[in-house]
Swiss-Prot record:
GO cellular component: cytoplasm
Keywords of the record: Hydrolase
Cofactor: a divalent metal cation
HAMAP family to which the protein is assigned, alphabetical: Nudix_RppH (MF_00298)
GO molecular function: mRNA 5'-diphosphatase activity
UniProt xrefs under Pfam families: NUDIX
Function: Accelerates the degradation of transcripts by removing pyrophosphate from the 5'-end of triphosphorylated RNA, leading to a more labile monophosphorylated state that can stimulate subsequent ribonuclease cleavage.
Source species of the chain: Azoarcus sp. (strain BH72)
Class of the enzyme per the UniProt entry, highest EC level: hydrolase
InterPro entries: Nudix_hydrolase (IPR020476), NUDIX_hydrolase-like_dom_sf (IPR015797), NUDIX_hydrolase_CS (IPR020084), NUDIX_hydrolase_dom (IPR000086), RppH (IPR022927)
Keyword Hydrolase attached: yes
Stated name of the protein: RNA pyrophosphohydrolase
Disulfide bond residue pairs: none
Amino acid sequence: MLDREGYRPNVGIILVNARNEVFWGKRIREHSWQFPQGGIKHGESPEQAMYRELYEEVGLRPEHVKILGRTRGWLRYDVPKHWIRREWRNTYRGQKQIWYLLRLVGRDTDVCLRASTHPEFDAWRWSEYWVPLEAVIEFKRQVYQQALTELSRLLFRSKPAELPEGYRQGTASQA
């Protein structure tokens, strides 16, 4: 399901623990790390998609998390042409995402990367909130920067978080 501009509706999930560290999943059989994310199915709300993806990719159920907030609007990224299947190249541009910030209220042992028959991750870890942007695949960096920056105000209310290098407005690399 694509919108008129060629973007696939999608949700992204920033899951934090009590120390405000983020869940970082290692893509199966790859050396890249990312946040959980996935497409919104026809007839599904972004929140329903978020809970489905959270279970499929991380094995967590709604009772394991608390929603702290979400991005105000869609954040978009274009996928490089050489990553797009040939039959989709004339219509598909990339993803548009609503990002959710979730607090784990369950335990680390509730995480199960094999909850679905098609696992996305083969390892995971907790990382500092401001993940190094160079660790993010280049074409997703700006969206990660935008989502982490926008949602940080929900975690760091008492003192404005000093944005690390690379998170200051307009400094993320773009594809």
